[in-house]
């Protein structure tokens, strides 16, 4: 090949575009070395000139095997158009200074640039390494320099890297590789010994998580794993160029390149070594190689694992159905060759397999098809098989070798150690973090090689849910057969061979310590913190002894923890996780029967009493004292509570989940809301009569009916339209407790309770003040008894007994559950007693009505019957004042002149 002109600093530029050379995939028969299979998998390949000692990829006839490569013919013209496919896609007229160079085009533009152009690569992995994905990218070429020059080279660009790409430079006794990604303005740089006058193979790989690695003659030379931020780096061009730049302050070097190759993935160390040995010949040395240069006297044997790694990389691009993918991975795990693994191959196989598993978990159909957990458990078992094979076949000459890494699937460790090499008091995996497993040092007694495999899965727990207790070997969980379990922590695995010597008794030692930080979903956290539920946490492991993964707690005990973490002690090793079971609080059968009996009897009695109350109010409606607004409110409240309790009694015999049950749930919701709404009206009316006077009763009549019947209807319409499926679908014909629809009842009910309690306190203070004044003026001790009586009378109509329902939310508040059942179910009885049977106005009206009936039966007095008035009931003639003062009237001279008839 022809050498390039004198270069001040030999550069490899990626400025990028579209007319690359693609490599044929069929391996020629004449080239059986596995390194040529690595070369055949390249994305772009420019063989350039034939160089003695550097082998190219040939077909069966010995011809160069490339695609879309046109070797430029001899040109006599001084100028050619470079949009000719023989040159490049540049649409400019250039001067061919040297003609054909390395089967590229050596150009000199007006700006004085001396370059080899290979085309442009817009929007590709080559133009932007950040677009290569997690697989990364690899650049490879052979390079040599021809010594110093005394004359300067033609003028060229000075120190610029264009677009996202890389730069390779040799100057002043140093070689360097720089790689830049414009997307995040990151730069990686590594230095190495520059090539001399002998052909040197330079290859570098880049992966976003591993950074830059530079290999010289097949061996890792230097690296930059982290990189740094650089915002002022490069120009936005897209050409792929090998060329030179001039710096008058530096020495000038001639340089030459051969076999320029790009893989759109990062090669493994084994692949790099195989390609290098293939390129230089099975037993050949590099031509003109000095004695001090590393040589390859023997050929690396065919790596039995390389085809598996390659197939995994290729097959995962075609993954679609989880079931098919799982069977493929299981076949891979069962057909792994029983051959030794170097550290590099073991690490590569581990990373590739776990990366493949990560691709499986990202399939849109995986979540749906893995709902029964069998698919996920099969995947975990397959991973265990592969990792066990890798650890058992890992070869090492050192007493302690550990391979560690992390992927989207799991954090892993594969170790092969001699126990005497372990000096720490315990072995811990992983070494850092809140979730880990510890093995005491005294449990590792074996003097032979010990293999250790650790896996901390990142997302596997999300796919292990809805576990039926009957399908587990956790006796405590079976106590609630309908309460499903779910994984509440990371899944962590640790396998040691030969197994550690552990106590078979949980009270003995040594034992395995498993410390797991909980990873709760929003639903899990909500269920766990709900006071109506009881939370159970189990230390569990996956038992594959039966061929299928079964969760078991045998040999494990939870020794410490809370809602954030759990600590377990176990007598064995395997896959561990914390299982969570949420059990709704349930009373004993005896308490359930007692509370049900109270509810049945109380509601039945209330229905009868409320019916009697409504009949009484209807019969006495012609009496003026019963026609006032207060008794209208009592009647509406009684009717709402009556209908609600009748519907409640009917719901006890309905089948949940049916359409009639759903309709009944809607009616229950509405009528219980109306009951609370009329309790609120009772409170507001009491406030207006005792504390303030807002106006006449007639002016508030429509407002009260709007609150009592209109507001509940509006709330129900909104609730039904937004969550109709929450009605009658749980264990009873009521709103589903697990959904937000329950707040369409609880919210208004709590509001009414709070408002009425405030009103009750205010009214009680007024009554107490009047009672105190009455006692001071008249010395009547019965005034204090009237305060207690007034409170007792107001409680049923204000609904404050529902406070006990709020307090009765757990099994530790059993007394409140009984109090709520008694007071709430007997609300109708209390209304009938306090506001009908024992009410003086109602009794007086009833006596008057009785007299009217008796007079009506006598024809002699029918025509003389006069309208009844409150004055007549009180024993006073119309127009005269009563001479008998009640305790309330005795205080009329005080400042508290209020209307207490509402009480």
Swiss-Prot record:
Which residues are recorded as binding 17beta-hydroxy-5alpha-androstan-3-one?
592
Signal recorded as keyword: yes
Q: How is its activity regulated?
A: Forms a heterodimer of 2 chains generated by proteolytic processing that remain associated through non-covalent interactions mediated by the GAIN-B domain. In the inactivated receptor, the Stachel sequence (also named stalk) is embedded in the GAIN-B domain, where it adopts a beta-strand conformation. On activation, the Stachel moves into the 7 transmembrane region and adopts a twisted hook-shaped configuration that forms contacts within the receptor, leading to coupling of a G-alpha protein, which activates signaling.
Per the database record, which ranges form the GAIN-B domain? 401-586
Pentraxin (PTX) domain sequence ranges: 111-305
Spans annotated as GPS: 539-586
Subunit description: Heterodimer of 2 chains generated by proteolytic processing; the large extracellular N-terminal fragment and the membrane-bound C-terminal fragment predominantly remain associated and non-covalently linked. Interacts with ESYT1; interaction takes place in absence of cytosolic calcium and inhibits the G protein-coupled receptor activity of ADGRD1.
Question: What's this protein's name?
Answer: Adhesion G-protein coupled receptor D1
This chain's source organism reads Mus musculus
Question: What lineage does UniProt assign to this protein's organism?
Answer: Eukaryota, Metazoa, Chordata, Craniata, Vertebrata
């Amino acid at each position: 090949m022809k050498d390039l002109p004198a270069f001040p600093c030999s550069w490899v530029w990626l400025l990028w575009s579209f007319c690359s050379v693609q490599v044929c995939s069929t391996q020629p028969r004449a080239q059986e070395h596995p390194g040529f299979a690595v070369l055949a998998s390249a994305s772009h390949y420019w063989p350039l000139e034939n160089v003695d000692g550097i082998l190219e990829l040939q077909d069966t006839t010995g011809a160069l095997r490339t695609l879309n490569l046109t070797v430029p013919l001899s040109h006599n013209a001084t100028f050619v158009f470079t949009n000719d496919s023989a040159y490049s896609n540049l649409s400019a007229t250039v001067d061919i200074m040297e003609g054909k160079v390395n089967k590229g085009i050596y150009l000199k533009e007006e700006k004085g640039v001396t370059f080899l152009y290979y085309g442009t690569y817009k929007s590709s992995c080559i133009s932007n390494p950040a677009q290569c994905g997690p697989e990364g990218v690899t650049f490879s070429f052979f390079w040599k320099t021809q010594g110093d020059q005394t004359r300067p080279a033609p003028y060229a660009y000075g120190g610029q890297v264009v677009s996202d790409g890389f730069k390779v430079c040799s100057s002043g006794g140093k070689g360097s590789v720089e790689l830049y990604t414009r997307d995040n303005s990151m730069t990686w740089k590594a230095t190495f010994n520059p090539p001399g006058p002998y052909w040197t193979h330079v290859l570098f790989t880049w992966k976003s998580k591993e950074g830059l690695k530079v290999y010289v003659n097949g061996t890792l030379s230097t690296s930059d794993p982290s990189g740094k931020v650089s915002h002022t780096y490069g120009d936005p061009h897209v050409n792929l160029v090998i060329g030179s730049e001039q710096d008058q302050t530096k020495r000038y070097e001639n340089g030459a390149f051969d076999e320029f190759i790009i893989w759109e993935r990062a090669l493994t160390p084994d692949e790099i070594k195989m390609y290098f040995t293939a390129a230089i010949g099975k037993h050949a040395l590099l031509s003109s190689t000095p004695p001090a240069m590393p040589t390859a006297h023997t050929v690396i044997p065919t790596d039995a694992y390389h085809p598996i790694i390659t197939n995994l990389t290729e097959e995962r691009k075609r993954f679609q159905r989880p079931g098919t993918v799982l069977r493929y991975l299981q076949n891979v795990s069962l057909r792994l060759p029983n051959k030794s693994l170097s550290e590099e191959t073991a690490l590569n196989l581990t990373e590739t397999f776990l990366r493949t598993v990560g691709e499986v978990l990202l399939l849109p159909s995986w979540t749906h098809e893995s709902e029964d957990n069998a698919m996920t458990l099969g995947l975990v078992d397959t991973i265990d098989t592969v990792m066990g094979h890798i650890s058992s076949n890992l070869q090492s000459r050192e007493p302690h070798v550990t391979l560690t890494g992390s992927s989207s699937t799991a954090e892993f460790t594969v170790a092969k150690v001699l126990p005497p090499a372990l000096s720490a008091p315990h072995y811990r995996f992983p070494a850092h973090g809140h979730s880990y497993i510890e093995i005491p040092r005294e449990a590792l007694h074996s003097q032979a090689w010990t293999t250790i495999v650790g896996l901390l899965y990142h997302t596997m727990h999300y796919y292990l849910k809805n576990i039926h207790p009957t399908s587990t070997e956790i006796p405590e969980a079976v106590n609630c057969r309908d309460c499903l379990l779910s994984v509440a922590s990371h899944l962590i695995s640790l396998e040691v061979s030969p197994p550690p010597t552990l106590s078979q008794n949980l009270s003995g030692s040594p034992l395995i310590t498993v410390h797991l930080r909980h990873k709760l979903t929003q639903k899990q956290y909500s269920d766990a913190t709900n006071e109506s539920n009881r939370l159970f946490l189990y230390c569990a492991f996956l038992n594959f002894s039966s061929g299928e993964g079964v969760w078991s707690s045998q040999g494990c005990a939870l020794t410490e923890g809370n809602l954030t973490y759990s600590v377990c002690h176990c007598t064995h090793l395997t896959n561990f996780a914390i299982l969570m079971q949420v059990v709704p609080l349930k009373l004993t059968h005896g308490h359930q029967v007692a509370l049900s009996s109270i509810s049945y009897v109380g509601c039945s009695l209330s229905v009868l009493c409320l019916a009697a109350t409504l009949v009484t109010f209807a019969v006495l409606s012609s009496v003026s004292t019963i026609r006032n607004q207060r008794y209208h409110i009592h009647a509406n409240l009684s009717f709402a509570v009556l209908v609600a309790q009748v519907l409640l009694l009917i719901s006890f015999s309905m089948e949940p989940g049916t359409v009639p049950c759903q309709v009944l749930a809607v009616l229950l919701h509405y009528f219980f809301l109306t009951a609370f709404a009329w309790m609120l009206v009772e409170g507001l009316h009491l406030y207006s009569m005792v504390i303030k006077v807002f106006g006449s009763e007639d002016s508030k009549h429509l407002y009260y009916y709007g609150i009592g019947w209109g507001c509940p209807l509006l709330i129900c319409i909104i609730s039904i339209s937004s969550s109709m499926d929450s009605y009658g679908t749980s264990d009873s014909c009521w709103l589903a407790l697990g959904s937000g629809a329950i707040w369409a009842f609880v919210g208004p009910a709590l509001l009414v309770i709070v408002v009425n309690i405030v009103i009750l306190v205010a009214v009680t203070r007024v009554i107490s003040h009047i009672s105190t004044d009455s006692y001071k003026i008249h010395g009547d001790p019965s005034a204090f008894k009237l305060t207690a009586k007034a409170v007792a009378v107001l409680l049923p109509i204000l609904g404050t007994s529902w406070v006990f329902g709020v307090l009765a939310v757990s099994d530790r508040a059993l007394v409140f559950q009984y109090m709520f059942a008694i007071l709430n179910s007997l609300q109708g009885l209390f209304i009938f007693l306090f506001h009908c049977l024992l009410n003086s106005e109602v009794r007086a009206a009833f006596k008057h009505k009785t007299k009217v009936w008796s007079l009506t039966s006598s024809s002699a007095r029918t025509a003389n019957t006069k309208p009844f008035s409150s004055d007549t009931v009180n024993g006073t003639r119309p127009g005269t004042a009563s001479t008998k003062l009640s305790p309330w009237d005795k205080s009329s001279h005080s400042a508290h002149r209020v209307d207490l008839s509402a009480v």
